[in-house]
Every structure is written in C-alpha cells, then in structure tokens.
Amino acid sequence: MGVFNYESETTSVIPAARLFKAFILEGDTLIPKVAPQAISSVENIEGNGGPGTIKKITFPEGSPFKYVKERVDEVDHANFKYSYSMIEGGALGDTLEKICNEIKIVATPDGGSILKISNKYHTKGDHEMKAEHMKAIKEKGEALLRAVESYLLAHSDAYN
C-alpha cells in the first residue's frame, strides 16, 4: 500500500466562521441544494454528525459513481477544521483503500478566508496516484465551494 499526498489552498471572500458553518457544518443539506448536478443527497447512516459518523453521499443519475460513504474523523469548531475519510463507494474503485481529507478554514485580514486542504490517497498494492487525477478531484471540490460561495453572496442573511 502506498500513500500519496496532495495539498492545496483556495481563497474565498466569505468569512471563515460563516464558510465553516455553511460548507462544513450544514453542507449536507446546502450542497445538494446549490449543486444538485454534483450531489443528489447526503444522509447520516450512523452517528450524529460528529467523529465516527458515517455518511452516504449519493450522486445524480448519469454520474460515473452511484455513491460514496465517508466517515467523519474530526470536527474542530474552534479552529474551523474538519477531517473525514472516504471509506466505500465507486470513487475508490479497485485501486484505492481510502482517501483521508482535512479542510482547515483560516480567516484572512480582508475578511475572507483561505481553505487549506490536505488529501491522503491510500492505494491498494503498488498502484500510484497520478497528479492529474488528484488535481481533477480538487477541481470538483472547488466547484462545490464556489456554488456555496455564490449562494452565500446572494443570501447575506444565511448561515451567519
């Protein structure tokens, strides 16, 4: 088994606390609403949203995968940090055992925020992750962020 790391940063004009609340804490309901072409639904299979919770993310018809299951590893409200692992489903395929993800949202002096994202791809056997594949996954995540950001800009009273 190999572990391949991919780290990235992206900026947002949304303040860190508001973005954490909307994108992370309430994302299970907000993201399917603002990006139904990407995610149909999110449901808790077990747990209450905290560490140990298992979530099932269902993708719309026509997507390359039907669903994935994720386990919440950490929710740090004080430091706007969220960690989770993708543990089952089509996105893992025959080559990945799991993907561990960490998102930390940091406030910027201008009132916006920086999302610091770390992904660890745990492969099966001697399979290697290609940089372009990891970059494509990052771009899909960034598209979800932009959908949430657009919603928040259009609804200034939401998720405050």
Curated annotation (Swiss-Prot):
Query: What are the record keywords, sorted?
Result: Allergen, Cytoplasm, Pathogenesis-related protein, Plant defense
GO terms for molecular function, please?
A: abscisic acid binding; protein phosphatase inhibitor activity; signaling receptor activity
Question: In the UniProt record, which is one GO cellular component term?
Answer: nucleus
Query: What is this protein's record name?
Result: Major pollen allergen Bet v 1-K
Tell me the gene name: BETV1K
> What InterPro entries does its record include?
Bet_v_I/MLP, Bet_v_I_allergen, Plant_def-hormone_signal, START-like_dom_sf
Which residues are listed for brassinolide binding in this entry? K55, Y82, Y84, N101
Reported function: May be a general steroid carrier protein.
Coiled-coil residues: none
GO biological process: any one? defense response
Taxonomic path:
Eukaryota, Viridiplantae, Streptophyta, Embryophyta, Tracheophyta
Which Gene3D superfamilies does the UniProt entry name for this protein? 3.30.530.20
Where does the record say this protein resides? Cytoplasm
Report whether Cytoplasm shows up as a keyword of the record. yes
Work out whether the entry's keyword set contains Ribonucleoprotein: no
